[in-house]
């Protein structure tokens, strides 16, 4: 039973790592599109956008979907703080 359980757990680990790789690729493409859409802000918001993109990039590197959410939220907040000519387009 122990050998069967360990083989089963190895199979589960392989399937989890495959799904993490796929989500990491999709998150990377989403993060890069967020960087392009939310860029070009004036005033103090480029710093906020840069911090959001760096945090998002680090989290995406680990395969966590939260990275994209953090980048998007920081892009929107940066747009609101900078005025009407800035934000995600």
Swiss-Prot record:
The gene is hssl16. Coiled coil: none annotated. Belongs to the hssA/B family. GO terms for biological process: sorocarp development. It comes from the Eukaryota. This is HssA/B-like protein 16. The lineage of its organism: Eukaryota, Amoebozoa, Evosea, Eumycetozoa, Dictyostelia. It comes from Dictyostelium discoideum. Pfam families: Coiled.
């Amino acid at each position: 039973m122990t050998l069967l359980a360990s083989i089963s757990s190895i199979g589960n680990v392989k399937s989890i790592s495959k799904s993490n790789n796929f989500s990491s690729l999709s998150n990377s493409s989403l993060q890069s599109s967020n960087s392009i859409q939310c860029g070009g802000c004036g005033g103090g918001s480029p710093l906020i956008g840069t911090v959001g993109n760096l945090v998002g990039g680090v989290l995406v590197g680990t395969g966590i979907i939260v990275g994209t959410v953090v980048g998007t939220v920081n892009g929107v907040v940066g747009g609101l703080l900078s005025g009407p000519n800035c934000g995600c387009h």
